[in-house]
């Protein structure tokens, strides 16, 4: 899980999910996981 100032989709299978005030990117590729906030 990478903590970033700006998260974005890296590939077509990445999904942006908002949980509360946090923004996550989840993907079938575990390297693409990101968190903001």
From Swiss-Prot:
InterPro entries: Ribosomal_bL36, Ribosomal_bL36_sp. GO terms for molecular function: structural constituent of ribosome. Keywords: Chloroplast, Plastid, Ribonucleoprotein, Ribosomal protein. SUPFAM superfamilies: Ribosomal protein L36 (SSF57840). Its main location: plastid. It is found in: Plastid, Chloroplast. Signal peptide: none annotated. GO terms for biological process: translation. One of its GO terms (cellular component) is ribosome. HAMAP family: Ribosomal_bL36. Belongs to the bacterial ribosomal protein bL36 family. PANTHER family: 50S RIBOSOMAL PROTEIN L36, CHLOROPLASTIC, LARGE RIBOSOMAL SUBUNIT PROTEIN BL36C. This is Large ribosomal subunit protein bL36c. The lineage of its organism: Eukaryota, Viridiplantae, Streptophyta, Embryophyta, Tracheophyta.
């Amino acid at each position: 899980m990478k903590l970033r100032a700006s998260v974005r989709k890296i590939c077509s299978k990445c999904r942006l999910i908002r949980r509360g005030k946090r923004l996550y990117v989840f993907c079938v590729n575990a390297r693409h996981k990101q968190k903001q906030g």
